[in-house]
């Protein structure tokens, strides 16, 4: 259910784009992300850093898209967000000694520390590649194809990555 909740702004963006175009879709995505943050704050009293970063990036890049009437800003947003996640994962680990993947998943999984480090790097590389893929699609495909890629391509890539990661992790999980 959380996965669908996380996709809420993207799904609304996609639907609004299909009906009204990129600029209305951008405004819808900003409002949906604001609503998402407000709901999480109301419901849990704490909003994850990743959600705050997502809100900041959508407001800045979505706002630039609307103010300057230039769709390139909203198209760059996923790349900026993915690269910030990649940098954040690596900086937290290697500059501050915190493995954010372990902090997020450590209560659900018991893994050796070197495996957590590999997982952290794998996620950082995955986000870096997603950012590059987004730029490639932005510059080589139509706006409509980019919107489809944003919903289906990145979501599909995420699902495949999680499945492959889960298969890889099975050799490290202890029978309980």
Swiss-Prot record:
The keyword Membrane applies. The chain crosses the membrane at residues 3-23, 24-44, 49-69, 81-101, 121-141, 149-169. Keywords: Cell inner membrane, Cell membrane, Membrane, Transmembrane, Transmembrane helix. One of its GO terms (cellular component) is plasma membrane. Pfam families: IspA. It is a multi-pass membrane protein. InterPro entries: YciB. The keyword Cell inner membrane applies. Coiled coil: none annotated. It is found in: Cell inner membrane. Plays a role in cell envelope biogenesis, maintenance of cell envelope integrity and membrane homeostasis. HAMAP family: YciB. Belongs to the YciB family. This is Inner membrane-spanning protein YciB. It comes from Burkholderia vietnamiensis (strain G4 / LMG 22486) (Burkholderia cepacia (strain R1808)).
